[in-house]
C-alpha cells in the first residue's frame, strides 16, 4: 500500500536523529499528541452506534462498551456468528446501512474499513453527532482504567491472551480487548470494572 508506505516514511523522517536516551515510548506518545485525536468521556452512560460491527475488531469494542453499561447498536452488511453473539448481549444490529439508526446517538464509531462517505457517517455529521475512529473510541475506553497496551508486528494476540490469562489467574480480574478469542475463555473481550485493562493495539490504533 503506497499511501501507508509514504505515511510511515514521513513518520520515520520526522523522528530524525533522536538522543540516545529517548525511548520508543516517548516517540510514540509524541506522535500521538500530534495527531489531534478526539476523545469522549465513557464514565457516564452513552448511546453509541458502530458501523461495521461484525468484524473481530469492532465486535470486541461493542462487547466492551455494552458491558460498561452503554446503549450500543450496530450495523453490518451480512449476518455472522459474531453478529449473533452481539445480539445475545442485547446489542441491536441492523443488517445493511440505514442513516436513521444514528438518531439519538451521543457518538458514532466504526471500522477503519468503512468509507468516510458511508451514509450513517454522513447522517451523523449532518446532525452534528460526533464521529470517532476506532482508535479514538479505544483510547476513550483506555481512559477508564489502568491500561496495558500490547503492540508489535507479530505475536500481539498471543501475548495479550497470555497476559490476560496470567492476570486472571492472579486474581486481578482485568478487562481485556484482544484481536481474537482467548481459547480458555471462549471470548476476546470483556469489561470487568477492574483496575486493569489489557488491550491489543494494532497499526490502525
Model-predicted regions and their roles:
Residues 64, 87, 101, 112-205:
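Phosphate-binding loop of NTP-binding sites
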Residues 36-137, 196:
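N-terminal leader/targeting and accessory segments in enzymes
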